[in-house]
Amino acid sequence: DCPSDWSNHEGHCYRVFNEWMNWAD
């Protein structure tokens, strides 16, 4: 599961930092 402030897309969790996105499994 993703942290509550992260989003999920196609099975990957990601979090937006301003204009940057950090992708994580």
Swiss-Prot record:
Localisation: Secreted
GO molecular function, one term: toxin activity
A GO CC term assigned to this protein in UniProt: extracellular region
Family annotation (Gene3D superfamilies): Mannose-Binding Protein A, subunit A
InterPro entries assigned: C-type_lectin-like/link_sf, CTDL_fold
Tissue occurrence: Expressed by the venom gland.
Keywords: Disulfide bond, Hemostasis impairing toxin, Platelet aggregation inhibiting toxin, Secreted, Toxin
Disulfide-bond pairs as recorded: 2-13
Annotated function: Thrombin (F2) inhibitor that inhibits aggregation of rabbit platelets induced by alpha-thrombin.
Family according to the record: Belongs to the snaclec family.
Protein name per Swiss-Prot or TrEMBL: Snaclec bothroalternin subunit alpha/beta
The organism's taxonomic lineage, starting at the top: Eukaryota, Metazoa, Chordata, Craniata, Vertebrata
